[in-house]
Amino acid sequence: MSTIMVLNGPNLNLLGTREPATYGYETLADVEVMCREAALSLGHEVECHQSNHEGVLIDLIHEAGRRIKAGEVLGVVFNPGAYTHTSVALHDAIKGAEVPVIEVHISNVHAREAFRHHSYISPAAAGIVVGMGVQGYVLGIQGLVHKLKA
């Protein structure tokens, strides 16, 4: 049983209390339970991480790359939060570590402020789920497994 890493970027630890009209009332813990259940139903395990620090997320992507090569990890479902719009370093980490990533956004970033319309992550991602609420994580897991035929 391989592992799917679920990575969450800055401020996602505030899910459930931060702008619930935009992000909903589910907490990060709720999302992690949903992810575990979705992965288990597909024969996989989930390992969840959240960090407000870009370097920590880069290190986790590098770790995922090493573990993919070792056959331990399938890929990554990643909500980079605001780093989506600013981080060339995360883009480079994904490309450099050769990690299959499904980019997830809870809200429809294209229906929000103009600065949210550009993603540095998308060109490096295997797929993108946008605007489906926290269900997007489940769709991301399903999409990753389907895309990699695991």
UniProtKB/Swiss-Prot annotation:
Top-tier EC class: lyase
Residues under site feature: Transition state stabilizer: 18
Catalytic-site annotation from UniProt: 23 (proton acceptor), 105 (proton donor)
Repeat listed as a keyword: no
GO molecular function: 3-dehydroquinate dehydratase activity
Catalysed conversion reaction: 3-dehydroquinate = 3-dehydroshikimate + H2O
EC number(s) from the headed UniProt entry: 4.2.1.10
Amino-acid biosynthesis found in the keyword field: yes
GO aspect biological process, one term: aromatic amino acid family biosynthetic process
Residues noted as binding substrate in the record, renumbered to the chain: 79, 85, 92, 106-107, 116
Keywords in alphabetical order: Amino-acid biosynthesis, Aromatic amino acid biosynthesis, Lyase
Matching CDD domains: DHQase_II
Pathway annotation: Metabolic intermediate biosynthesis; chorismate biosynthesis; chorismate from D-erythrose 4-phosphate and phosphoenolpyruvate: step 3/7
Family: Belongs to the type-II 3-dehydroquinase family.
Function noted in UniProt: Catalyzes a trans-dehydration via an enolate intermediate.
Family annotation (HAMAP family): AroQ
Subunit organization: Homododecamer.
Entry protein name: 3-dehydroquinate dehydratase
Name of the coding gene: aroQ
